[in-house]
Regions:
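NAD(P)H dinucleotide-binding glycine-rich loop of Rossmann-like/cofactor-binding domains
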Residues: 88-164
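C-terminal hydrophobic helical "lid"/dimerization subdomain
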Residues: 240-244, 285, 289-340
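Mid-domain Rossmann-like dinucleotide-binding core that forms the NAD(H)/NADP(H) cofactor-binding site
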Residues: 82, 132-211, 216
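Glycine-rich beta-strand-centered segment in the early N-terminal region that forms part
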Residues: 20-34, 47-89, 129-131
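Short Gly/Pro-enriched turn/cap motifs at secondary-structure boundaries
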Residues: 7, 19, 53-60, 106-110, ...
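Glycine-rich cofactor phosphate-binding loops and adjacent beta1-alpha1 units
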Residues: 153, 201-276, 339-340
Length: 340
């Protein structure tokens, strides 16, 4: 089969590989669509920032159809349409704690979804309804990351939420805040095209940080600051601005990868504001199922986040390199079988 294999910094190769032998608790998935995640891009550019095994088939945001099941598989059957829950938790029922402990993942420690077929443990599989298109189902994973962060922040009806960064994770955070009932959703980015998408997703206010000081503008609108802020950009400036945008005793959530150390005046900015900083990784089974249901019922306009669809042969040039060089790109999907 054709597969994209990660060898190290800026070294992803499209190769022919044998499909691995199916074990009793495994399922064989014919991959339909796979998304390029920000963490995939970090592995491509900054290998030390992402724990991965070399010579792995990468990709953890994907969907497809089961074509074979192992002898001990009881929940799934041939023909089931599925998406992937890539965190390989030892005890998925304890995801609230274990998602911060277990870092093994599909596409990093076992072969992932940038391939024609994937052999996966049955615990990493979620069945999807027939009315959920497979290309949309490939985005369940990033949507769940953002929705879980909004849950962890305990966003409630009437809250004011600021999101720094309008890439896919930031845009899904906007949707999560909207579903949670936030009254005001402010998005900050450097590109008008991304801010336009944020408005389409439900942002009530947007600011281009190249044109205005976002903290000043947010404080003009909401003098006390935001109830919560979400840092989804992954740079030093937005980290500090997110803290400064948050109200006294509010919470700032970090869901971005920071590949470099940052500087911030922690004692002063935190002691004298009472702002809490927290992080979130992964998701619970409950959140995953909620996102699947919302996407299937049309409650999330996820199609708008897709900016390109490419073939696996062009993964590096039209995928990874495009995300680096064309900042108008948001979510790039890779077509494998292309099934609907």
């Amino acid at each position: 089969m054709k597969a994209a294999v990660w060898y190290g910094e800026r070294d992803i190769r499209i190769e022919e590989r044998e499909v691995k032998e199916l074990q009793p608790n495994d399922v064989k998935v014919k991959v339909a669509w796979a998304g390029i995640c920000g963490s995939d891009l970090h592995a491509y550019l900054h290998p030390d920032s992402v724990p991965m095994n070399k010579n792995m088939v990468i990709g953890h945001e994907f969907s497809g159809e089961i074509v074979e099941v192992g002898s001990h598989v009881t929940k799934f059957k041939e023909g089931d349409r599925v998406c992937i829950y890539p965190m390989m938790l030892k005890d998925p029922s304890n995801a609230e704690t274990e998602r911060f402990i277990t870092i093994d993942a599909v596409g990093a420690h076992i072969d992932g979804g940038f391939a024609e077929y994937a052999i996966l443990p049955q615990k990493t599989i979620f069945k999807i309804p027939d009315n959920l298109p497979l290309e949309v189902a490939a985005m369940v994973e990033p949507a769940a990351v953002s929705f879980q962060s909004i849950k962890d922040l305990n966003v409630k009806e009437g809250d004011t939420v600021v999101v720094y960064g309008a890439g896919p994770i930031g845009l899904f955070a906007v949707l999560g805040a909207k579903v949670a009932g936030a009254s005001n959703i402010i998005v900050v980015d450097l590109l008008d095209s991304r801010l336009d998408k944020a408005t389409e997703m439900g942002a009530t206010h947007v600011f281009n940080a190249k044109e205005v000081n976002p903290v000043e503008e947010i404080r003009k609108l909401f003098p006390d600051g935001a109830d919560v802020t979400v840092e989804a950009a992954g740079v030093e400036s937005t980290f500090n601005q997110a803290i400064q945008s948050t109200k006294v005793r509010g919470t700032m959530m970090v869901i971005s990868f920071h590949t470099e150390d940052i500087q911030f005046n922690g004692p002063a900015s935190l002691i004298f504001s009472g702002v809490k900083i927290m992080g979130s990784v992964g998701y619970s089974n409950e959140t995953y199922n909620e996102v699947i249901e919302l996407l299937a019922n049309g409650g999330l306009p996820a199609q708008s986040i897709i900016t390109s669809k490419i073939n696996i042969d062009n993964l590096v040039e039209q995928g990874f390199e495009a995300l680096m060089n064309d900042k108008s790109q948001s979510k790039i999907l890779v077509k494998l079988s292309g099934a609907h």
